[in-house]
Amino acid sequence: MASPVAIAAQAGKLLRERALRPLLAVRSQAGHLTPRRWLNLQEYQSKKLMSEHGVRVQRFFVANTAKEALEAAKRLNAKEIVLKAQILAGGRGKGVFNSGLKGGVHLTKDPKVVGELAQQMIGYNLATKQTPKEGVKVNKVMVAEALDISRETYLAILMDRSHNGPVIVGSPQGGVDIEEVAASSPELIFKEQIDIFEGIKDSQAQRMAENLGFLGSLKNQAADQITKLYHLFLKIDATQVEVNPFGETPEGQVVCFDAKINFDDNAEFRQKDIFAMDDKSENEPIENEAARYDLKYIGLDGNIACFVNGAGLAMATCDIIFLNGGKPANFLDLGGGVKEAQVYEAFKLLTSDPKVEAILVNIFGGIVNCAIIANGITKACRELELKVPLVVRLEGTNVQEAQNILKSSGLPITSAVDLEDAAKKAVASVAKK
């Protein structure tokens, strides 16, 4: 059996890896990319799911108007009320509305104030560090009972590839950046590996509750909540359920105060109700258009469009462009099961961006057939009358056939032997202008 120190170190490593996964955020040398999860739930939606599965959360209502917010505050009849703007981006507390109101999270004891604040939130844009400069329009607010927290802990359930199954990770130090805790105090990180076939054992839930510092009757409460969170994790096909803080109140209740839930996109066919909750209103129109064709698109500030298959290769392409003195205009992931029509639509999206001065295609054909890519490229170039330089690097399945298609097309397409060569040629084509 591994020592407690080894387990803590492994759990800390898992948390740091979790922070780097594309489901949350990806940092590239080319800039800060924040890929939107293809299913992204608002805070109130996550809490509703938890509540429906027996997990204890604060009492709350959702309001679409200031009048509804006022009525909700009265119905709560709470000592103190917290009003939260509902957007997907983080940093709401320090955000600023274009109505002049500062802060997307407010505490008050007066229901009247809730109505007044909601009037300055709903229908206005809230700008935070994670939104575009102009902010994101707030369509709903959450009116919740504000509970005192006497102690904060951290709890997460996530998939661990090294274990080939779910793992529960916890720390008695919650309400803070858990990656920092894992790095500075790994002994405060605890881990329970769950057998996917047997499920969570009561002894595991009790042990985690004890490691989080819950004592007496609170220990049983915490273990019960941990078990319910695990069952929720399985039932909704989550890849991660993170509760921070997972805390206790002065009245002796264990409550999940805030939660982030990530889902397995491949489970959409059996989680239709959950996926129907996805709010795409905060997306850029081009992102929604890309999603119609199973393309993943993220706009950036540069002038070299990237057309790539696979998120990892897309990030590497952005980095190489940056290292060669260029700036990527986007992050476009074509994915695996490619059709010629997708290639055509991808080019339509890329050429619709007025910032784009060159296009770099970087495809590694494992599942992808390079010949299909080549046919899609030539069709797009002809029908869209492409006016910007096009650099193409293809490698893998049917690459020779693909190269012959490009060569015989008679189109002004620049071929590249590898990614470095492609990036240099794309950057040079823009520099000539």
UniProtKB/Swiss-Prot annotation:
Domain ATP-grasp per the UniProt entry, residue ranges: 47-275
Swiss-Prot/TrEMBL catalytic activity: GTP + succinate + CoA = succinyl-CoA + GDP + phosphate
Keyword annotations: Acetylation, GTP-binding, Ligase, Magnesium, Metal-binding, Mitochondrion, Nucleotide-binding, Phosphoprotein, Transit peptide, Tricarboxylic acid cycle
Site (Important for substrate specificity): 80, 148
Role: GTP-specific succinyl-CoA synthetase functions in the citric acid cycle (TCA), coupling the hydrolysis of succinyl-CoA to the synthesis of GTP and thus represents the only step of substrate-level phosphorylation in the TCA. The beta subunit provides nucleotide specificity of the enzyme and binds the substrate succinate, while the binding sites for coenzyme A and phosphate are found in the alpha subunit.
HAMAP family membership: Succ_CoA_beta, Succ_CoA_betaG_euk
Protein name: Succinate--CoA ligase [GDP-forming] subunit beta, mitochondrial
